[in-house]
């Protein structure tokens, strides 16, 4: 992805950025705000594709590890466009579902949500579907850090299709090596486009950030970006 930051944009005539992606961590939003540059992303454009990836991965994992999904509990961290669809997939499999989403919990109340600590203690499957925020109230950078892995009780399988930096790679490797987790399913990697070869060799499923790649996802993202451009320029 092109990094849309001060180095690229300063002195240019750019007034609007449309990214055909869910994530926008490649856009320096603070600089854009200072420079008067508006931007938009495409939330939910490929959510069905990512949910299908999770569905397929769970079926593969179930088969390889001889698991009965309807006896397990899944923790979904981030319950937006993707996470909500993953919850439906899990429910259809008969899996007990726990949801963690701090921004939604603060808006909607605690009734439907639980803490990350409870997910760490009770879940056999933990899957991450949060945007990458490197700082601030809802920081997700290294959300799964050493403290998180040390709090795990059930040796879960860890799934990440959000952003590589949401999980501390070094700590993830340590957890795989010492048995704190049973498996990992990884589609996103720290420091992309590089892929950590040691981690790749240890995960049960490893893919190069393709969970959301589908014809429908690309078409949706393109349409959403085009609509945003037309709206901005009053076309």
Where are these regions (language model features)?
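Phosphate/diphosphate ligand-binding glycine-rich loop within oxidoreductases
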Residues: 1-65
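A short helix->loop->beta-strand "cap" motif at the edges of active sites that frequently abuts
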Residues: 11-15, 35-38, 95, 154-156, ...
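C-terminal helix-to-coil terminal segments
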Residues: 33, 40-49, 192-235
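Glycine-rich adenosine-cofactor-binding loop
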Residues: 43, 51, 70-91
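Oxidoreductase and adenylate-handling cofactor-binding alpha/beta cores
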Residues: 51-67, 92-95, 223-231
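NAD(P)-binding Rossmann-fold cofactor-contacting core
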Residues: 92-109
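Rossmann-like adenosine-cofactor binding region
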Residues: 105-197
């Amino acid at each position: 992805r092109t990094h849309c930051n001060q180095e690229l944009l300063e002195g240019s005539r750019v007034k609007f950025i449309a990214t055909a992606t869910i994530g926008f961590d490649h856009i320096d939003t603070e600089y854009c705000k200072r420079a008067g540059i508006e931007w938009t992303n495409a939330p939910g454009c490929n959510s069905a594709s990512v949910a299908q990836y999770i569905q397929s991965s769970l079926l593969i994992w179930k088969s390889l590890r001889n698991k009965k999904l309807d006896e397990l509990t899944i923790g979904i961290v981030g319950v937006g466009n993707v996470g909500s669809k993953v919850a439906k997939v899990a429910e259809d499999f008969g899996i007990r579902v726990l949801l963690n989403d701090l921004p939604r919990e603060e808006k909607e109340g605690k009734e439907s949500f639980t803490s990350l600590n409870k997910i760490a203690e009770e879940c056999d499957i933990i899957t991450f579907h949060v945007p990458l925020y490197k700082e601030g109230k809802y920081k997700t950078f290294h959300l799964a850090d050493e403290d998180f892995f040390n709090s795990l009780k059930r040796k879960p399988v860890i799934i990440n299709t959000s952003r590589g930096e949401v999980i501390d790679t070094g700590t993830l490797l340590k957890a795989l090596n010492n048995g704190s987790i049973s498996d990992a399913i990884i589609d996103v990697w720290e420091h992309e486009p590089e892929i950590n070869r040691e981690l790749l060799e240890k995960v049960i499923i490893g893919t190069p950030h393709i969970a959301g790649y589908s014809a429908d996802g690309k078409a949706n993202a393109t349409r959403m970006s085009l609509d945003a451009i037309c709206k901005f320029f009053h076309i």
